[in-house]
């Protein structure tokens, strides 16, 4: 669990998951690794209908976002990251969309299990099997967008980039460039 650094003196650095080292990824990106499955993908459903975030979904008329793709057949799959305010997701971080409809082979990662029946956050197991798409701005004006899924990029080129995942990402990047 600890590794001795090379050089003068005895300096030990703890290795392993950021979460166990006191710096969970939720603090940096808004989301952290929560579940994993076979190389299959699912879709996102919009969760945030606040008018302040309509710009993210401009040009998207479908309810399901990313129910297609070259990586597992969907934008949300393989590894799923979710927001967790208890682990450091910033309070101003908004969950824009969450995935659902994952195959039964998806399981929580070990650090989410308290026992074989309960989870660390105390939430029902199925509710943690999701990818969250999040957005927030930090105190220095930086903007953060996280997809919460490793297969998101595989949905971008679907239909020659003429799809709701590409539209959504274009909306985000246009906002970032202003």
Residue ranges and their predicted role:
Residues 1-12:
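Short, small-residue-biased leader/transition segments that mark boundaries at the very start
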Residues 136-140, 170-173:
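Terminal low-complexity/disordered tails
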Residues 97, 143-146:
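Structural recognition of the beta-strand scaffold that forms the well-ordered cores
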Residues 160-177:
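Short secondary-structure subsegments characteristic of cysteine-rich extracellular domains
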Residues 13-139:
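Catalytic beta-strand/loop cores that center a nucleophilic Ser/Cys/Thr
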Residues 103-105, 152-155:
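Flexible loop/turn segments at secondary-structure boundaries
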Residues 6, 122, 153-162:
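Active-site rim elements
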Residues 140-141, 148-154:
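Catalytic grooves of carbohydrate-active enzymes
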